[in-house]
């Protein structure tokens, strides 16, 4: 249970091992000053070993910096005279007030001067042919762009594109749609997700075609919708993630080729949005959403800080195991284990050794704000024996992934705050452990290890800090301490509802299950079991089988780790308590 300080995703997606010529990239921009997330893509391309910036096309029809604003009364009079702007006035006022809620140091829409990043890149200043919201490129500009023999054009500017520009690059014009295109088409980005209470806010990368929202969807990423009433905050994670998504697909194109990229495109699906096209909200719509939202926040404000999240673990023996169930899951029969004052217990794992089942878990020390790893014997009656501390570092540890191999017991705890993936071996099980090797210097979260058919598999989650973990990557090696090989099916998931690991993979009755967290409604909200259907060095497929939400036990607000060993099951749960009662 931790949030890493940095991300390895940028460095991973800057390096390709394929022996192919570098991708020739063109950029469509509205000017040298671009949002921070765009600047990040430009920087990553420039620092990659597989792509080259060959051309920049500046939109000379883009809005220019606004002249000095008129006094407020004059602006109000001008707005109120227009019936259309009158209907939308409240949203404009809301945006001005909400702008101050954006993060000061890491706003992905903050303007960045990209001129230094683009120094030396050929530039075209282009006046598009404008018709309504549509832009077409003049024939002479098309000829010049064709001369660059571009592989991909990345659209960060201009309006809706039509005409020959869509065909001039070998693999088309790639464009980001800031929303999940299966549910939200139109705009403004990330407002309607808040308005409708959508659990996730997405970003979609597509290859543009003549038909709006009908391009080839190369990929999408889904982030938790930020609770509350701030679009400025809700947009941050998806915009940051859009830069990662674009680099991931460019990397995939170079590493594996166009046919592979095209085969992994997301197939068309029926549009499920409540509106055909979302538009700027009217005054009535803003008021209908904003007033009750603010009122609810005001009512809850006096209680903020009175309750704090507190995690515990629970055991069940002899019940119908979760893997054998379908939705809705039956979680009856679990018994909670109380934590001593000053501690919480979470991230439980089970292992059988010498006829005894042991539980390993994160033992969080409130006084030091860090986790250590503790363990206890699972008693025949379903409780735990004495809790014993078994692994401690001067940095936070959690998610004690314990497993056996060739008679030894190993552990890979999460140590993302140290920027490492560490392998420990038990020298005197269960309480004495020795660092065997630092497997990777990556800020991987909740690394889950699996051994099958002579190969080792490492499932690791990553974040775009300071955002949540929405990216699951799979690596494999020919030995436990061998070199990690990036799996071609990566990313396994870019969905906050199923990316992050939620416990050890297990095999029962010939079926393999990977537990995964659902963080859409808040950190550690729920979890699911996913049956692994295909696992080879070339392919990976899984399917969800059963999901668990915190409603299974009164008072829970989260439940995010599950383990199974024989007839014993273990789970954790989070509830809100008075801090004075547990610290």
Regions found by a protein language model. Name each.
Residues 344-353, 398-405, 446-452, 504-508, ...:
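Structural signature of eukaryotic scaffold interfaces centered on beta-propeller domains
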Residues 364-368, 416-419, 463-467, 519-522:
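Short glycine/acidic-enriched loop and turn motifs that connect beta-strands
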Residues 427-430, 477-482, 531-541:
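Short loop/turn segments immediately following beta-strands, especially the blade-tip
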Residues 2-397, 401-404, 409-410, 422-425, ...:
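One-carbon transfer enzymes
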Residues 361-363, 413-414, 460-462, 516-518, ...:
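Recurrent small/Gly-Pro-centered beta-turn motifs in extracellular repeat architectures
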Residues 488-504, 538-562:
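Conserved blade-ending motifs and adjacent loop-strand segments that build the rim/top face
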Residues 526-535, 553-583:
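Blade-level signature of beta-propeller repeat domains, shared across WD40, Kelch, NHL, RCC1
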Residues 436-507:
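Aromatic-anchored, glycine/proline-accented short structural segments
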